[in-house]
Amino acid sequence: MYKRQNCLILNHYAADIPDDRFTAMMRLDHNRALSMASKKLGVAVSDLTNMTVWGNHANTQFPDVTYLKVKGEAAADKFDKSWLTDEFIPKVAMRGGEIIKVRGASSAASAATGAITHMRDWYQGTPKGDWVTVALPSDGSYGIPEGLVYGVPCTSDGSGWQRVKDLEISAAQAERMKTTAEDLESERDAVKKLGLLG
């Protein structure tokens, strides 16, 4: 079962619980994106803020450095487009598969770290001026179909997740965001056909 769809099913059948209490992890992808970007720039992961991974935990996801900062300064123009397109985006998206191919098993430690940091920031709050990626039922922001469990940038003050809103989205970003939304919609439709959202 697709993890985002597990979240969707729970949300569907527990309608009396607020939507923002249902999340699916994108933190493993978020952490991988930060790690790759930090290596490329030759800086510590802790120097980076505002990484975003839009969409699904799948090869259609969109790791996005548009808003990334290094020590508070814009970093997007520090990456060449070919590296982003040919290495960064596909390698972050396909990292899990690469690990399984090499090791014959998933990276349980990385997944556990993702779970720990997801829960820590949910309950203790995200650092001021930073955000993390969380998959939660869409409220329609950024043209993402409402109700679709989709990774978006979020902050937390310790009481729950708040979506980062009103970010400027380019046509190129929108196209990649649409592709991963369509992937999630096809997964949701498959779940519907199984009668799990009836």
Where are these regions (language model features)?
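Conserved small/polar residues in nucleotide/adenosyl-binding loops
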Residues: 1-2
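Short Gly/Thr/Asp-enriched flexible loops that form oxyanion-binding sites at enzyme active sites
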Residues: 6-14
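C-terminal substrate-binding/catalytic lobe of Rossmann-fold NAD(P)-dependent dehydrogenases
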Residues: 13-23, 28-198
